[in-house]
Amino acid sequence: VQLTNRINRIQTSPTALVISAAEQLKAKGVDIADFGPGEPDFPTPDHIKKAAIKAIEENRTKYTPTGGIAPLREAIPAWHSRELSSNYSPKECAVTVGGKHAIFNAICVLVQAGDEVILPAPYWVSFPDIIKYAGANPVIVQTRPDSGFSAKAADIEKAITAKTKVVIINSPSNPTGGAVDGAEFERILALCRKHNIWLMADECYSHFVYDPHKPFSIASAKDSKDHVIVIGSVSKTFAMTGWRIGYALAPEPLIQAIVKIQSQSTSNPTSIAQYAALEAMRGTMDTVPPMLAEYTKRRKRIVEGLRAISGVSCEWPAGAFYAFPNISAYLGEGKNSLAKTCTELSKLLLEKAHVALVPGEAFGAPGFLRLSYATSLERIDVGLRRLENFFAHAEAAV
């Protein structure tokens, strides 16, 4: 089958491939310590589920406006204002089929062939391919473990050219958990103002940050609106990944363009899911602190466990629910090497140790592995024991 150059520029999500391989082994009865999925293991809160049931019972199952039902387009800016001190109106909000869809739509209306998008690495797996699909080129700016994988304005400035149209900042970050502090974020915003560039702030993990960090949005900065696009989602904060509701907050002309492209692709997000999201936005936030408390325990367990493995180093994530250890000591051609690449090593770990994780190459970070600790302490302990045993008996394992 002859496919377009556009589709040939992108690849299937590497995380989806890892999940698929792990599921195949699970189907054969193999017990897998699964650190692959990037989603909360908590259920959607009951009050949100009940709102969806009520919507079904009230027959709210028809088409809705493409950009979302009016109450939700009012509730999202109001929630964002309460939680993150921004100031958006309903006309500056578009509801999308998940946060990824908001990113896709925004990139597609902002860039064209030959444009550049600055992307700090390690990056979320879908960013480069969305940029390429839109015809633009990702310009990668490396972050460093010793700075907590936090993007720096000075590094971004060096990458800006006349072709730069967007800078993407995902904070807290998937895959590293790195977070950009408010002062640094404002320096990045100042750069974007200076060069007339859009700053896309992916805030999908905004409420999962660890002391001393606090939830932050660059949209709270003075006069930020003209250069900022906020991307958000109910997926992580409210454990609603499968409901597929995200949003964009931006100046009205950009929102109108996002709604236009959505009108010719998905049309409206699922009506029932929108009413569930409406309850999430209007209802209690009491379910978030217990989730964060549990992630805090898991973070401590997994980072300390990884650091106890000889040859492995791991920074403390500032947010999200991922550990991102450096395992480069076990890669290459040397006598202690287990594989040439992280991708090869992750396959070995799945096949030999029955541990599923995502290789760093997927995130533009060879030499690293991503482990999601959105799983129980008991399963974290099982996985850590298997990893420790694998690396301790490396020659036998290979």
Short names for language-model regions:
Residues 278, 293-303, 314-333, 367:
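Conserved glycine-rich beta-strand-loop-beta hairpin in the small C-terminal domain of fold type I
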Residues 133-139:
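A short helix-loop-beta submotif of the ANL/AMP-binding
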Residues 221-296, 300-309, 390:
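Conserved core segment of the aminotransferase class I/II
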Residues 18, 35, 52, 76, ...:
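Generic structural signal for small/hydrophobic residues in well-ordered secondary structure
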Residues 2-98, 105, 134, 280-283, ...:
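N-terminal small-domain helix-loop-helix segment of the aminotransferase-like
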Residues 109-131:
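Conserved PLP-anchoring active-site segment centered on the Schiff-base-forming lysine
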Residues 139, 143-216:
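Active-site phosphate-binding strand-loop segment of PLP-dependent enzymes
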